[in-house]
């Protein structure tokens, strides 16, 4: 190989590496934007693996899980998919998918294809929740010191546990005047503020999209703090208007897709 050829090959390698890094960075930025934007649809789909799956040969399970990666790649331009292992921590499901898109139909199209994969045909869909991210209803009416406290950043570091709790309010809540609701949500918020550093939360509005009114999503590395948070929230007046809290409550651990598929391919 001539010196010019070696230089040319080196330049191509550098360009390819730079493009890959740029592409990964762009994908990460797009992901963060979609997860933080308002007007984004979130779908939580929980599944149990049927008994026939474990009767397959290991090679067949590996081939079946490989088809899942193809579906995720196919829909990558329209949806962001997060994966969670519930097996061993929840009787409700073995696997949870959290899907985000700017249109709910994109979540549906992904799930339809996912359930046609070699793994998907062995999954029983035990729960599906749909919600929409919206601006805060009550925070604009809170005192400035409360607003400032709500900006407390969550501690850095991995948060391996994920909890999903759907909530349905009673009719009295929706008939309540705005001032009273703001006051009760202020009490709710004050109870939650001490845990902002260790628990990351995301709220989805589900009215008309699901049987629930809200889907609450949490990530944490400190389950003791999470337990204390829920106990604190159960002691405020607003809790009296929760007709349904959980049922199901989904508890799992956060894992990349490859790790999840490896668990089911073993």
Residue ranges of each PLM-predicted region?
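Bacterial N-terminal signal peptides
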Residues: 12-22
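Catalytic micro-motifs at enzyme active sites that drive phosphoryl/nucleotidyl and oxygen chemistry
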Residues: 31-32, 81-87, 114-116, 151-153, ...
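Bacterial N-terminal signal peptides that target proteins for export
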Residues: 2-12
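A common structural junction motif
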Residues: 114-122, 234-242
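Short S/T/G/P-rich N-terminal loop/turn motif that feeds into the first structured element of a domain
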Residues: 28-76, 104-107, 128-194, 207-211, ...
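A cross-kingdom feature marking solvent-exposed beta-strand/loop segments within repeated
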Residues: 64-66, 78-96, 197-202, 212, ...
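Sec/Tat signal peptide C-region and signal peptidase I cleavage site
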Residues: 22-28
